[in-house]
């Protein structure tokens, strides 16, 4: 190895000494990424103080320490001389290298290694492999014989850099959420999440993103925009009408050229260096779905094959995507779990722990909207909320302009903009009528603007760039659209491992697991009632809102117990539940607002159903995928879609009517009756309602793989095929003589007649009881024998029936890590275990204020307190019998007065009590069965 003597230091790539050994004795401090004021503001926004990260010198191999607080002054990268004991004296250095080190002056222990051109205060410590000049100033500080190790011939470069990267990996922590990163550029990009800054903006729809890759993915939706063309199928008439028709046609052509020119305009700003993707289309041969990349096609084809190539090495669970496997593997890792000191709940990340601790303290960062005063816990939520105000302001001006009547537009004088537009279109203003002049003026104002204005529909749907080709519904993300398409295709990728039932969404499967496990994790804090679904708990809490108002809760407790205060009126409450109920009185929150009429709703499902009212017949008859076909048959409708936002469809139609042009946007489509407005574009079937059309389109989308062996017709499901096969059979000749019901087969008729004749062929040999089916008899025999033949392999518990064993085994599927040390009973959550341990400890924490009786659970004391409530004395004066229901009490009194309030519905006979009525109804039943048996016997003799 050649060594150059001089004053330039040792280059990093030659590493004449063991650089890993050198880093083991250094101390690193992170660079400052923003000033002290921004850091203090970010730390103050946290619900609690962030954990301090300090790596001990004796325990950590890289000896890195992160300062708990930052200053505005940039830190220096200081080098400390390693002790002589850390290097082996047996290792001998190279002679040439030794001479070179002897020529270098020794460095001090506080010498900085950053040069003058490196902006450390802005970027922090960057990656060593891409910024090697950081190590050019390293100098020798100890004698060479003690510092340099012997050269290892078997050590390769790749292994050396891999070890180096392991030592300095993830040394850039975020001071807000404590998340760490490998490179400072990744930390700078991550800080945009906390600041809420979104610097990358789409110049087509105005949507903003915080990462350039998200913007590139978003721009693909604008790549394949179709241009509408105008076909002149009607000959122009004479006079003024001909001039107006020529103006409309010329305007449409000019609009198309302007739209094409605006699409080819060079982008500016942050998007100037963003290339559009040039990938070709790739089509799936099974469902004809088109993808931009071939890798996306391969990933999509796994849905059809059902293959799951990625499996977990711990639990052997398989997945069809690598990202899903990576997300699942984190659930098995316990190395990074942090625990809450209050409730003991564990988390994999510190950021999740900080969010969880805010639920105990009751405090959260307050980001308020300046327009409406609404507050949010995260800056991203505030930015999304502000977009609602921006869309509302953008919609007000175009809507006012659209409401201008046509008569006032025609009366407007000819402006300079109108004359310039007429000269652009090659039309003389003096030779056209007022209707054509109005249209020219609108077009002139369109060209006079510096940029094309968006119509109100585009502004309203600016955040919904992914539209469904079946029902036309828009979504803001491509993943949401893919999940929505499962409704039309019938795809259900999520399957229950217990019963095999399939679901479209993963959270539907999670909710379905409650049916098997019978787990009820959602508990009411007031009465202790538990529920399996959060929606059930929300509906249950509405009962307490009526029974326990806020004044009742505040009047029975001392002031020191009222820890939750209202920020609006200052009233205090004992818990967050009563505080939330009180805040609803202030704001009456209905967060879901209709963009068209402004109506508010409390649930998003109600808003979705409400939006169907505003959909016009033209939008429902022709989905978005068919807009290009419809535009080819419209001469005036093209002007309506490319004209400025203040040119309404009524004005264009009036101008065309003045010119004598028949502007029928649906002239190439068959006329649909007024009663059935919505027609299918595939088969032509018509429907009265739009939902009927959407439901009908499932027939064309679902794959039909089951064929009838008689006529060859295909079906999607086995049940549909079974119903179809019965149409090929003869009529139902097997009729029940008692009730007249008809059956396809004689076996079905015989099984049905057992209900009338009470024929029970399967009888018990011990008690003589008869049953309709054999498995009923097998279940009944367990009562006499007491045999429990079904045994659980996990806990050795035995059961009498197989269904009971299957239901018991489902409890072992769900993890129950919380075990009681006294009785061994297991629980899923720690809160349930703590509540259970009160029984062993004898702690009855709930005491009745009236009688002093104590209870273990809050549900027990609530049930007990009902006995203290004042109730009417419903006691019979004759027999001293007590009743809870006034209805039964009044009927009971009639029996002592000689009345017969209980009547038979068949014959009208009345009885004084229910026992006599039940015996009488049983007599009617036996009469019907005897008549049916006699009728069957008579048919057998014939």
From Swiss-Prot:
The record's annotation in InterPro entries points to:
Znf_C2H2_sf, Znf_C2H2_type
Molecular function via GO: DNA binding; zinc ion binding
- Compartments reported by the entry: Nucleus
The record describes the protein's role as: May be involved in transcriptional regulation.
By sequence similarity, the record places it as follows:
Belongs to the krueppel C2H2-type zinc-finger protein family.
Tell me the name of the encoding gene. Answer: znf865
Q: Which organism is it from?
A: Xenopus tropicalis (Western clawed frog)
Q: By its UniProt entry, which Pfam families does this protein fall under?
A: zf-C2H2, zf-C2H2_6
Q: Which domain of life is it from?
A: Eukaryota
Q: Name one GO cellular component term.
A: nucleus
Keywords (A to Z) from UniProt: DNA-binding, Metal-binding, Nucleus, Repeat, Transcription, Transcription regulation, Zinc, Zinc-finger
Q: What is its main location?
A: nucleus
Zinc finger motifs (C2H2-type), residue ranges: 172-194, 200-222, 282-304, 310-332, 338-360, 367-389, 466-488, 494-516, 522-544, 564-586, 592-614, 678-700, 706-728, 734-756, 762-784, 790-812, 818-840, 846-868, 874-896, 902-924
Q: List the disulfide bonds.
A: none
**Which protein are we looking at?**
Zinc finger protein 865
Q: Where is the composition biased (Polar residues)?
A: 96-106
PANTHER family under this entry?
IP01243P-RELATED, ZINC FINGER PROTEIN
